Amino acid sequence: MNDSYFEEMTFQCAAYERAKKERAERKAQIAEARGYDSPEMDAWYAEEKAAGPYPYSGGEMKAYWVYKMRRENDGDEFEMSDYCWDKEFHDFIETLRKLGITEFTITNKSTALMENIYGFIAEGCTMVGTHTITKKSLRWGEEEYETAQGILFKVN
């Protein structure tokens, strides 16, 4: 696993969120002091546009959360409990590769599951078969373990 790539993603996301929060606070101050039709607000909008989009795509962030949840839950396996949209497959799988993840289990039970299976295969993954994972969960302040059924994929 590539902890350094994960740490870099964590750092970049935190920096973006801090800057976004500061800009939002500054916008509120400008609106209060000068109003929305002021030159200061125009400058704020230009700054907001220059800040650019979030540093990572939706697919990259889903891979990040797969990695993060495994670390936080002291798990042995990577679980994808969400689903990918069509535009997210490539970035999701590429980020898993960068993170050094060689297999994951999708446990999502949505109607998009079939599309996700085909999307992962199209990105070069191999469907291994059904797989049950055990994961730690926190319920009512108590840690307990539960199982989840899913489909195991190898990231090639």
Residue ranges and their predicted role:
Residues 126-156:
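C-terminal edge-of-domain segments
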Residues 113-128:
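Short, aromatic/basic amphipathic alpha-helical patches
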Residues 1-115:
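N-terminal leader/targeting segments
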